[in-house]
Amino acid sequence: ESHNIPEDLKIIDLSMDYRIKSDDHDFIYGLPELNRRATCTAKHVANPGCFATCIQLGLLPLAKNLMLTDDISVNAITGSTGAGVKPGATSHFSWRNNNISVYKAFEHQHVPEIKQSLQQLQNSFDSDIDFIPYRGDFPRGIFATLVVKTKVALEEIVRMYEEYYAKDSFVHIVDKNIDLKQVVNTNKCLIH
């Protein structure tokens, strides 16, 4: 069914339909830490995916400094609410309780939007993102480990991250090990 949408209506789309840039639509990829100015003025915003947001926040400072020159390895575990609202065999508590499982290894639907964002900052980025997502035994949050190769000293990398996120209220660079309880039910992202 088709509906007439007023020209001046602002839309934030939560699906993945408009996350990839295309001449067929005018949606802005709505990750503020990447596209703050464009997102604030856009009429149409595509909301980023959950894993995509997490992984991009971990990689954007490296892309900005042209440091992504090799394959990237990502292991990330999500809570049950990451599966959406549609009940499925692997989203029920009785299945997830005391359980962890892999799904869509190396073929997750968020990889193209991650690559698109990294290329926005580092045009030369063309490496693989070897992403293994997991379903976890908890309701909310994502915990991710990202591995990249670099010869740059850790102190310099920390400085890059602190500089990149200096004006972002919800991304925090921390020097202690992190746990999921520090971010659950908040809009914070902790990077260690």
Residue ranges and their predicted role:
Residues E1-A105, N123-S124:
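N-terminal Rossmann-like NAD(P) cofactor-binding subdomain of oxidoreductases
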